[in-house]
Amino acid sequence: VNSSVVKITLSNPNGGFIRNLAWGDAIILDPETADSAVSEPNGTGPFKFSKWIKGDRVELVKNYDYWGEAIALEKASFKFISDPTAAFAALMAGDVDAFPVYPAPETLAQFEADPNFNVIVGSTEGETILSTNNKSEKLKDIRVRKAIAHAINRQAIVDGAMFGFGTPIGTHFAPHHPDYIDLTAQSNYDPEKSKSLLSEAGVSNSLTLSLKLPPPSYARRGGEIIASQLREVGIETKIENLEWAQWLEQVFKGKDYDLTIVSHTEPMDIGIYGNPSYYFQYDSQEFRNLMDALNLETNDQERSKILKNAQKLIADDYVNGYLFQLAKTGVANSKLIGLWKNSPTQANDLTGVSWSN
């Protein structure tokens, strides 16, 4: 249309198109440098790529040619620190100024009591689930999946693994979304009901499941708690801790697992249940029909009805164990202002960040 406005014409209506453009993956690249974007990105944002020291950090500098309002920061450095103990030490030593998503919730109280830091607690789009391989011979029977759901005490997991940070969920949808329906009562903690369902399925005290866990603390800690809860109803688990590369290869790609725990942080990603080849292998034509209707629907009220029906369907089918919505727990130097409290998409946006005097 002009130098700063484009017109996009779609071949079919797509009610989610505008939302998709807000994803972190939806970026604008210079066609002349797009092929080298993986190692030397050249985009349109308020920062320019400066340096990538693999395994250590990525450095950005201010883009003085930015089309929008000028930013306050001259540069920013993103360091890679995955170990919770190292994260705590880095903040205390002043080696880093902020952890937008801090990996050690057990030490947040210490930062809250320290005037040199701000603890920033908000919401994410991360549905944390006990992902279930629906094609596993041990888990094909809905009564077994339902028994697992009733064996799980969500609040105990939130308290024990996340130190109280998180909101229990009963389906794959963010509680802060206006179309969310609370279905937690449908799979409430009821060990006796769980035992009865296992008996009906003919697997009482004879079921052993693999539980493969990726690195995040919510998975490792949550996995131990869930294993204990399942043991109380007669289900044994074989826990295997994996690094991300192993998890992606064995679980996500290879589908070689019974249970795993992961937080799905993409916004409005309930559509993954429409893909029977996705790693939990849920195959429902009824659900696919709902997603087809959703993609073509542009009326918000009609989309809301479809989304609520979709939430109910996957809860009724006990596709996965729905645990909690991941909280965004951040820690920052008290003089640093403007960091996101909530995480509506997968991004660390520093556009509005500055240092106070």
Residue ranges and their predicted role:
Residues 85-96, 113-114, 142-143, 224-233, ...:
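Short helices/loops that flank or line small-molecule/ion binding pockets
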Residues 53, 151-179, 218-227, 245-357:
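Detector for C-terminal structural segments
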Residues 35, 64-109, 236-238:
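Ligand-site clamp/hinge motif
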Residues 1-29:
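Surface-exposed binding/hinge segments that line
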Residues 8, 68-79, 95, 204-211, ...:
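A local structural motif
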Residues 3-9, 45-46, 73-75, 92-93, ...:
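Alpha-helical secondary-structure segments
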Residues 19-71, 75, 83-85, 192, ...:
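Gly/Pro-rich hinge or "lid" segments in bacterial periplasmic/extracellular proteins
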Residues 120-132, 176, 284-290:
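Periplasmic-binding protein-like
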